[in-house]
């Protein structure tokens, strides 16, 4: 199996560098109006769908990361232009970013979402890495946004409120993306490493103490104000894609901090995701479970396949012998699942949703997924080099 994964990694890297990055640079970046499009249709043409705020910093991340990895296309215009558009269109007087604009760059929903702010932080860190001349600016912007978030919606126990005034349920997912932004920021030259490391530690412990159920080891999505599971069905929701994504993040954190507990928690998250979160017939990760691990939504979306791959390959890099072989086999299954979603007529696009019967939903390719795919391909390359 070990050899297969090297072949899959090569195929995925070729797809990314030769097809996806050129296509999303040429058709996915709006050279006239600025910014990134929300979707590209299956013929390879951009749509005029409304543009979610999160898509802009996610695509900035993609092109900044591609530039850092030596992709020879024009990543810089897209990365810098995308941030400029994000600031101009979504930026609010208070320093936060709104939620939704139309294709003409008019903001149509200015509401605050912690999730969107987390991606701004991720973009700042990656731009600082690849454009050192903008490092000081990114440090300043990053610090300012972190302090504003702490002032606006710091939770009295740990983590963050959804907004000010507080609203329920509280969510684990915005914290996951903040955690990711912290782990990126604490590594960047010039960034306030102590502040970012402290926030990363706080979120890691909140996840291990509250988000993850002490008995089952699964991670919930929705919580009451005291970080107890939210009442009713909503509090029972478990997303296998997020189990893998949290496992991957906790492994990264555990390796930096030497924290054995986080590895134990991550291993259990992975186990549930692989055993209960994948459909045996289609060998794909499904969308939603309940907290008894029964399937709530058998739809399979593309992004959880990438998180399965990231977690499996990082576990493989951290283990050895038979255990490593098991994780490599799992990574091979995840890569195969991902490749089925990438198998479309126009190379460089993807399907987003597979129905329970195995057929794919006919719809344009969402730009928001690129961040998941690109990150997984780079993680696969990096972890294979460590073995």
Curated annotation (Swiss-Prot):
EC number: 5.3.1.8
GO MF annotations in UniProt: mannose-6-phosphate isomerase activity
Top EC category: isomerase
Presence of the UniProt keyword Acyltransferase in the record: no
SUPFAM superfamilies linked: Six-hairpin glycosidases
Presence of the UniProt keyword Hydrolase in the record: no
UniProtKB keywords: Isomerase
Catalytic activity of the protein: D-mannose 6-phosphate = D-fructose 6-phosphate
Matches recorded under Gene3D superfamilies: 1.50.10.10
One BP term from GO: carbohydrate metabolic process
Disulfide bonds: none
Stated family: Belongs to the N-acylglucosamine 2-epimerase family.
UniProt protein name: Mannose-6-phosphate isomerase
Organism: Rhizobium meliloti (strain 1021)
Biological classification of the source: Bacteria, Pseudomonadati, Pseudomonadota, Alphaproteobacteria, Hyphomicrobiales
Gene: pmi
């Amino acid at each position: 199996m070990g050899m297969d994964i090297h072949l899959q990694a090569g195929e995925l890297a070729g797809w990314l560098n030769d097809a996806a990055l050129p296509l999303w640079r040429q058709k996915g970046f709006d050279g006239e109006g600025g910014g990134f499009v929300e979707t590209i249709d299956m013929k390879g043409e951009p749509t005029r769908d409304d543009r979610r705020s999160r898509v802009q910093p996610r695509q900035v991340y993609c092109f900044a990361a591609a530039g850092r990895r030596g992709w020879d296309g024009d990543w810089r215009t897209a990365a810098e232009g995308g941030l400029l558009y994000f600031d101009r269109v979504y930026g609010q007087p208070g320093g936060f970013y709104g939620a939704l604009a139309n294709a003409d760059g008019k903001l149509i929903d200015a509401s605050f979402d912690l999730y969107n702010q987390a991606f701004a932080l991720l973009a700042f860190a990656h731009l600082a890495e690849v454009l050192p001349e903008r490092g000081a600016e990114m440090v300043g912007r990053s610090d300012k946004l972190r302090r504003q978030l702490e002032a606006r919606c710091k939770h009295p126990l740990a983590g963050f409120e959804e907004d000010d005034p507080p609203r329920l349920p509280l969510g684990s997912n915005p914290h996951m993306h903040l955690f990711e932004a912290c782990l990126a920021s604490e590594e960047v030259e010039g960034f306030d490493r102590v502040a970012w490391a402290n926030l990363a530690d706080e979120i890691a412990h909140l996840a291990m103490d509250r988000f993850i159920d002490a008995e089952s080891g699964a991670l919930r999505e929705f919580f009451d104000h005291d970080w107890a599971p939210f009442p009713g069905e909503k509090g029972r929701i478990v997303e296998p894609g997020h189990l893998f994504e949290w496992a991957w993040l906790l492994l990264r954190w555990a390796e930096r901090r030497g924290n054995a507990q986080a590895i134990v928690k991550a291993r259990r998250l992975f186990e549930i995701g692989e055993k209960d979160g994948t459909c045996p017939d289609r060998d794909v990760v499904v969308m939603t479970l309940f907290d008894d691990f029964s399937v709530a939504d058998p739809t399979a979306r593309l992004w959880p396949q990438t998180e399965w791959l990231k977690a499996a390959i990082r576990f493989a890099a951290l283990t050895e012998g038979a255990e490593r072989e098991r994780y490599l086999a799992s990574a091979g299954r995840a890569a195969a699942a991902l490749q089925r979603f990438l198998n479309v007529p126009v190379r460089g696009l993807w399907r987003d949703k597979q129905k329970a019967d195995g057929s794919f939903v006919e719809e344009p390719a969402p730009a928001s997924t690129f961040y998941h795919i690109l990150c997984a391909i780079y993680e696969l390359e990096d972890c294979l080099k460590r073995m």
